[in-house]
């Protein structure tokens, strides 16, 4: 049987595509440093690079583009939904014969033309962002046609994050003596109070870490699986020494630095959701295994004991002091999030079907928010990506993106089982890691606006592409 992946791989491995892949690695490695693309000019520069790489890829493969897109057939439905989602945002910036003076009423009026978006220029910028996210998702799916490329991308994302974590800890303990990327107001927490990486907001950085930390475990699994046959007959001490002195030793050290950095963000949601995502991932993997109930119960018990042991060790080492101090003083107090959520709900009630335009929430929210929130810039976001999406794009936009995301998540979940059946071996750890990463940011977005930081959104789609592609590879 001839595989489309094999035929397509010959095309995609030519030198021109290798250069595109290397350039993509460079772009995603650098992208977290300038505030993760928080400022418009930063991300427009970043998105220009992504669009340029995509254009170069399609020019290089113009003769075989139809064969290339055959590889996307398995996720055709979510890609169609994502395309319609982008077209809906185009519709939001085009003048239409409708009357929206009363936000609750959307009537046809051929004598008065206006846009759905209350600020079309802002929505246009958001459209460019969202288009670049979907573009890099498709480009990554097309480029990841070999096991080596998948591993290389995972290593790039993980090592880049580890370097930022080291930078964060150095500044945390030196009180910002080596700060290269200052926070943008209103996010002005001191380094000793909260590590925030190269970002402004520590919760954004915490979400970034929960995306990239699981990749380290996947890479370690990959190396262990690859070297398992070479270590037959060796003593446990010898295997342990080899582990510590090998690439895996570097990965373990990097993971330690990254996990400590996560604690030092003092992000209650980020740390809690990270643990929850690990638990969810464990039970999803366990569910996919055809094992006796007793064996599953044994694994669950060992997992719980292991989690408790790690938690106790971490707490007693003092690495969680920033987090424990915040929890001691604030607990899980929502810090005004309930009022921010109510603000979003008020806007949704006014224009439920089509929304006010992508990216317009910060502009409109002051008319609806409670006086208790004051004029602080921190309340310009809903601190819930789902509510903000509903207010910006209404039921139509929310349904399109939500359905596409759920279908991709289902594909990722089913891939956990498919990877085991196809015996993709060393990549199975990365398959699990990608599922854990995706679950983490989706859950954290219930209490924050993580997808509004461009680098988090781009890394989400990169890791999602890794998880979707692994089950499709031949051994």
Q: Positions of the model-derived regions?
A:
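Aromatic-rich transmembrane-lumenal/periplasmic boundary elements in polytopic membrane proteins
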Residues: 95-108, 122, 167-183, 196, ...
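Alpha-helical transmembrane segments of multi-pass inner-membrane proteins
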Residues: 1-15, 19-34, 44-58, 79-93, ...
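Juxtamembrane membrane-water interface segments that cap and precede transmembrane helices
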Residues: 32-33, 107-120, 185-198, 335, ...
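TM-adjacent membrane-interface loops and short helices in multi-pass inner/ER membrane proteins
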Residues: 92, 201, 338-380, 386-389, ...
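Cytoplasmic juxtamembrane interface segments
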Residues: 58-72, 137-153, 321-339
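Transmembrane alpha-helix boundary signature
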Residues: 58-72, 88-106, 111-115, 121, ...
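Short beta-alpha connecting loops at secondary-structure transitions
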Residues: 324-330, 374-375, 422-427
């Amino acid at each position: 049987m001839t595989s489309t992946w094999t035929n397509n791989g010959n095309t995609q491995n030519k030198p021109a595509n290798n250069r595109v892949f290397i350039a993509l690695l460079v772009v995603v490695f650098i992208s977290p440093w300038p505030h993760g693309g928080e400022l418009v000019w930063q991300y427009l520069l970043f998105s220009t690079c992504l669009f340029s790489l995509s254009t170069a890829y399609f020019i290089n493969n113009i003769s075989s583009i139809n064969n290339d897109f055959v590889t996307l057939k398995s996720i055709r439905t979510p890609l169609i939904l994502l395309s319609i989602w982008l077209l809906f945002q185009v519709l939001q910036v085009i003048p239409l014969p409708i009357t929206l003076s009363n936000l609750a009423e959307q009537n046809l009026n051929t004598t008065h033309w206006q846009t759905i978006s209350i600020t079309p220029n802002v929505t246009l910028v958001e459209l460019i962002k969202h288009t670049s996210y979907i573009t890099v998702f498709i480009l990554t799916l097309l480029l990841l046609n070999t096991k080596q490329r998948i591993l290389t991308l995972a290593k790039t994302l993980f090592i880049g994050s580890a370097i930022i974590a080291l930078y964060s800890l150095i500044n945390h303990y030196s009180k910002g003596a080596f700060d290269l990327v200052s926070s943008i107001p209103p996010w002005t927490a001191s380094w000793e109070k909260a590590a925030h990486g190269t970002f402004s907001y520590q919760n954004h950085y915490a979400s970034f870490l929960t995306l990239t930390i699981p990749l380290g475990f996947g890479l370690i699994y990959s190396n262990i699986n690859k070297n398992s046959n070479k270590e037959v007959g060796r003593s446990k001490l010898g295997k342990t020494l080899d582990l510590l002195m090998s690439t895996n030793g570097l990965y373990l050290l990097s993971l330690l630095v990254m996990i400590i950095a996560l604690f030092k963000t003092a992000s209650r949601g980020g740390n809690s959701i990270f643990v929850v995502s690990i638990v969810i991932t464990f039970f999803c993997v366990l569910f996919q295994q055809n094992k006796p109930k007793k064996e599953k119960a044994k694994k669950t018990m060992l997992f719980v004991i292991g989690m408790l042991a790690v938690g106790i060790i971490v707490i007693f080492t003092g690495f969680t002091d920033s987090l424990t101090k915040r929890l001691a003083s604030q607990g899980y107090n929502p810090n005004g999030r309930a009022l921010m959520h109510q603000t979003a709900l008020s806007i949704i009630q006014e224009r439920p079907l089509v929304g006010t335009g992508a990216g317009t929430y910060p502009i409109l929210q002051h008319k609806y928010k409670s006086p208790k929130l004051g004029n602080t810039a921190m309340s310009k976001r809903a601190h819930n990506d789902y509510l903000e999406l509903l207010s910006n794009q209404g039921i139509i936009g929310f349904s399109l993106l939500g359905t596409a995301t759920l279908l991709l998540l289902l594909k990722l979940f089913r891939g956990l089982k498919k990877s085991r059946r196809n015996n993709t071996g060393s990549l199975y750890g990365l398959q699990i890691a990608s599922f854990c990463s995706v679950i983490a940011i989706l859950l954290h977005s219930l209490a924050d606006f993580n997808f509004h930081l461009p680098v988090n959104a781009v890394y989400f789609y990169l890791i999602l592409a890794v998880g979707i592609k692994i089950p499709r590879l031949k051994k």
